[in-house]
């Protein structure tokens, strides 16, 4: 459904890259370094890059010089979009562990999301904590996300957990994107890798 929009975004990337698109597959390029040296205006990444990008060192910025904006690729209504938000990680407790270990784990999980010390650690080292009375992180990217949300913008969610055989599926898509970007391959091959590849991996996992 959104493959043309994906193409719009991908073409925007490669046609405005700091290097020749034909050279991108050669490797050795550092988008963060290019961004830090002001060779690039935009740099696609996530909130986890905040600590690397902020500071007083070479290639780092002050808090007032960074911001995060949504993806725009021609989807109807995207002017009302906020930042993409998702995760591929979940907390879990092993039911087969010793009872005292299970309880200790549950106690720790409660402590880390409710106590002043625990939520401060989360805010400073990991980012936002979606619990009442949690500390607010300094990460400006989270502040941007909250601003969009407060304004009523919708969130595009993602969760790699639901991608069937994510590494195999992703490898097929990356290969097709590389052929398209470097060797003038067909976008139809990207569509096939994305759509049919997903169906193939889903069938393998679910019968």
Named regions from a protein language model:
Residues 30-33, 50-57, 199-202:
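Pocket-flanking alpha-helical
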Residues 11, 16-19, 57-125:
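Extracytoplasmic/periplasmic substrate-recognition and gating elements
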Residues 1-6, 57-61, 73-83, 133-143:
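Short, solvent-exposed loop/beta-turn-alpha elements that line the ligand-binding surface or hinge
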Residues 1-24:
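Glycine-centered hinge/linker elements that transmit conformational signals in sensory
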Residues 21-36:
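Short helix-initiation/N-cap motifs at beta->coil->alpha
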Residues 28, 45-50, 87-89:
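Beta->alpha turn/N-cap motifs
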Residues 69-70, 122-179, 207:
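Long, aromatic- and glycine/proline-rich binding clefts that accommodate carbohydrate-like moieties
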Residues 37-46:
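Alpha-to-beta junction loops
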């Amino acid at each position: 459904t959104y493959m043309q929009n994906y193409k719009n975004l991908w073409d925007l990337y490669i046609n405005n890259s700091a290097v020749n698109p034909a050279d991108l597959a050669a490797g050795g390029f550092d988008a963060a370094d290019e961004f830090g040296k002001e060779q690039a205006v935009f740099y696609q990444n996530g909130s986890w890059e905040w600590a690397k990008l902020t500071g007083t060192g070479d290639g780092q910025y002050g808090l007032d010089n960074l911001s995060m904006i949504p993806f725009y690729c021609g989807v109807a209504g995207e002017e009302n979009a906020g930042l993409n938000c998702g995760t591929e990680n979940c907390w879990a407790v092993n039911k087969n562990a010793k009872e005292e270990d299970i309880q200790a784990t549950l106690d720790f999980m409660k402590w880390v999301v409710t106590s002043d010390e625990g939520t401060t650690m989360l805010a400073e080292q990991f980012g936002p904590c979606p619990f009442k009375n949690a500390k607010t992180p300094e990460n400006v990217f989270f502040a941007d996300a909250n601003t969009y949300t407060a304004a009523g913008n919708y969130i595009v969610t993602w969760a790699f957990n639901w991608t069937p055989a994510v590494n195999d599926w992703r490898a097929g898509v990356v290969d097709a994107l590389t052929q398209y970007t470097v060797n003038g391959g067909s976008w139809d091959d990207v569509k096939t890798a994305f759509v049919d590849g997903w169906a193939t991996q889903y069938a393998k996992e679910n019968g």
